[in-house]
Amino acid sequence: MNLEQKSDALYDFTVTSLTDILNAGVDVCMVQVGNEINKGMSGETFMSSVAELLKAGSSAVREVSKAAGKDIQVAVHYTDIDKQGEVAKITADLEKYGVDYDIFAMSYYSFWHGSMENMQDMAEYVQDTYGKKVVIAETSYCYTSEDGDGSGNSVSGDGDLVDGYDATVQGQADMLRDICAAADEADIM
């Protein structure tokens, strides 16, 4: 498929699936277009092309939302928020290419994406510079370093955990509590 065909397919799929979901009685308040799309989306890697896909998805959400008399928010989702330059470039490109969205969704894994203060700084940058809401779309923390499925873990528990947060049930609970508190402090949804 070329870019135009992909954009049309994404638009059609979003209209159909969102309409079906609403018709089933689900109260949808947000639709995320793309998932951790720093490196591209649907085989497209140039930001100008990714922006076309995002605009197609956003347009579909806006159309269905209006027809249903709803206020459904549009989110775009990125990772690697520990790199301020990356967040600045992504948000500048979203603006440059005219992507219509309400929420900048980000993944925050404390063992990969830096301190909670950095997460707050990135959120505040997006909020202050572009007036967008920010949400943490993904996070987690391990409660054990044991391999439970034979596939190998993303985090080994050997030097890659965050100081003060053990790989225990309590360590996981403490981390998630502290992430939620830091997010709340920075007005992150």
Can you name each region flagged by the protein language model?
Residues 107, 113-120, 167-170:
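Short, charged, low-hydrophobicity "junction" segments
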